[in-house]
């Protein structure tokens, strides 16, 4: 049985499916729980509008989102972008004055970029993905 922070093997069956925290419960890191629920809702609406039947739309929604969200659940288990706090505590247990004395800008940028990539928030990926607009029947 999956624990509260373990990725779920599936989000639904037939005409019943989960989204948001119900589908991908995770530690509250990265400040994106609400964002992920909105993205899920938008993707679900898009897939349902494109599908010939609701069951196919629900399956397409899960197929489109589950792998990325499972990676994000696992990333958040490791602290997500807040892993910076763990590293700083390890490197400077007695405190510090400037973050640059503890971590390089490259390290900070790398952690942030990796999380954006895992979450699907990289600017290039967002700017090149197809529109979620569904053509209305004439």
Regions found by a protein language model. Name each.
Residues 22-28, 42-54, 62-67, 84-138:
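C-terminal lid/capping helical subdomain adjacent to the catalytic/cofactor pocket in oxidative enzymes
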Residues 1-78, 82:
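Conserved mid-domain beta->alpha element of the FAD-binding
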């Amino acid at each position: 049985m999956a624990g509260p922070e373990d990725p779920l093997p599936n989000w639904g069956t037939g005409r019943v499916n989960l989204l948001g925290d119900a589908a991908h419960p995770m530690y509250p890191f990265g400040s994106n729980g609400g964002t992920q629920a909105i993205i899920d809702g938008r993707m679900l609406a898009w897939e349902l509008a494109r599908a010939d039947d609701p069951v196919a739309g629900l399956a397409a929604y899960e197929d489109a989102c589950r792998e990325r969200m499972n990676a994000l659940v696992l990333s958040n288990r490791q602290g997500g972008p807040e892993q910076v706090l763990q590293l700083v505590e390890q490197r400077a247990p007695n405190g510090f004055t400037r973050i640059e004395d503890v971590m390089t800008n490259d390290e900070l940028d790398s952690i942030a970029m990796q999380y954006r990539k895992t979450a699907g928030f990289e600017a290039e990926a967002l700017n090149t993905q197809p529109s979620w607009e569904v053509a209305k029947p004439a």
